[in-house]
Amino acid sequence: MTDSTNSQPKPESFEYLSKAQQQSEDVASQWDQDNQQWWNWYMTLAENEHDQNGRAVKPAPLSLQAPVEIDESTLAQIQDALSVPYKLSADSIEQFGRDGYIKLKNVIDPEHLRLLRQRINSILIDALGTESGLAFRSDEMMWLHDELVRHFVLSKRIAQIASELLGVQAVRLYHDNALSKEPGCGRTPWHYDYHHFPIDSLNVCTAWIPLQTIPSEMGPLAFAAGIDTYKLVKDLPFNKFDSSYDKQLGQIFADNHVPVDDGRFDLGEISFHHTLSFHTAGANRTNESRMALATTYFEDGARLVSSPTMISGEFHKFMPAIEPGDIINSEYNPVCYPNTD
């Protein structure tokens, strides 16, 4: 007689979870692998359309570009441009407070973003190789070793917007994050960052900076409108093994007629979303990588939560030597606005 429990196929997520994390349904333990493996796991939690064979569409091979050298004069121009204050309107601040997100046009010079895209692509290739099986490539803390990335991540212009949207006097950097959704990669699951970031504060927001125009078929970041929308689903249990949590979230938003902004991004347009803002991203159905740089800022004085979970990924690398309950002020969390440089 066959034991039917042994014949059940394991969830796709098991490929990326450690044995210890496979054996428990909760998320209380901390993540015990690197952040690329975290993304490999996390992307399995999205509800996706499948091909006729019942499998998620596999990513196409990467299209590689030669790295581009940037001279000191161009770097200085980029740094200067990213230091110019941005005139944020009262209407934009009001929308952010109401909807939990804002998309702002013409924040960054498109040519500067093209250079950044080439640089980040080179960084990802150096870090991860050219393996076509990676549907979603990521890297963090790039600002520590790349001058061009550092100008963007520590930009006074971008951090000023974050500070004014949050209504706080000063913001620090949590971390940078290169996000490359490859051709054929599926959806990013619905989530809100308060569930992810181990920061004991609501004054947290993320700038999402597309590195190319993102039409709807490329999977732009999409937002469930309403700063209080999270209340509809705050008691919904998270499932770390399959897409049921993501599927239920989408259904609840639809049943409650929550508006979803899934419009395109022009090059130079960036978004900011609050830590309580639910967001997702569609599949990349083009033949190009959908690349973005995300930088997260938090109010100066915020502390590390008492019990970080696996959903926070490899958070220790973003705030070395910071213990639960400590103020987050490591050398990797500089004050980005106001700054004295």
Language-model regions, residue ranges each:
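Short, conserved beta-strand element in jelly-roll/cupin
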Residues: 191, 198-216, 264-265, 272, ...
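A conserved hydrophobic position in a structured secondary element of the catalytic/binding core
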Residues: 144, 224, 273
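Conserved double-stranded beta-helix
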Residues: 2-39, 44, 229-278, 282-341
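Short, charged/polar surface micro-motifs in flexible loops or helix N-caps
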Residues: 168, 183-186, 214-216, 229, ...
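Residues that flank catalytic or metal-binding motifs in active/ligand-binding sites
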Residues: 174, 203, 217-219, 261, ...
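Core FKBP-type peptidyl-prolyl cis-trans isomerase
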Residues: 215-235
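Non-heme Fe(II)-dependent double-stranded beta-helix
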Residues: 2-99, 105-190, 196-199, 236, ...
